[in-house]
From Swiss-Prot:
Species name: Cyanidium caldarium
InterPro entries named among the record's database cross-references: T_IF-3_C_sf, T_IF-3_N_sf, Translation_initiation_fac_3, Translation_initiation_fac_3_C, Translation_initiation_fac_3_N
Subcellular location: Plastid, Chloroplast
General function of this protein: IF-3 binds to the 30S ribosomal subunit and shifts the equilibrium between 70S ribosomes and their 50S and 30S subunits in favor of the free subunits, thus enhancing the availability of 30S subunits on which protein synthesis initiation begins.
A biological-process GO annotation: ribosome disassembly
Record-linked Pfam families: IF3_C (PF00707), IF3_N (PF05198)
Protein name per its UniProtKB record: Translation initiation factor IF-3, chloroplastic
Family: Belongs to the IF-3 family.
Keywords (A to Z) from UniProt: Chloroplast, Initiation factor, Plastid, Protein biosynthesis
GO molecular function per UniProt: ribosome binding; translation initiation factor activity
GO CC annotation, single: cytosol
Domain of life the protein comes from: Eukaryota
Amino acid sequence: MLGGELLKYKSSKESHILINENINFPCVRVVDVTGKQLGILDTRQAVEYAKNQGVDLVLVNEISDPPVCKLIDYGKHKFIVEKRVKEGRKKQSGALVKEVKMTYKINEHDYETRLNQAFKFLKSGNKVKVTLTFKGREIQHLSLGTMLLNRLMTDLQQIAEVKRSPYQDGKTMILILTPKIVDPQ
């Protein structure tokens, strides 16, 4: 039980939560720990009832008339919410987008080097953005650039899938690859 302090969330959505004595409404609708409505009570009576139950009175909805408060162990509730948020962050994809740059006139050995780079990035679980740059009048040879990116896609098709097929953005052609999810069978 957290004796009437004004607790602040780190979230920008909720700047603060009112609990116990900090609830400034004359009467509130009280909801039990199990979700059962206890009815409309005077705020002081509701705080007293919460203390007798060993829980906190937390303002849930101040917009409704009368405002809705819930009886919960706020410390435990806050811990569970923070734990869920932390687990959610763990599950988020930490995949970075790695970039491999080349031109359409790339030599065979250099192409193999870029292919190996992309292969390593994909193996480590990162997305790969392949950027093909054209300088000056080279933009007239878009078909050669498309052929090169198609060749790269076929060379990496065993471990990568195309997230975005080759597209032109100004004087560059871009291809985005993501690692294939391998079934553990």
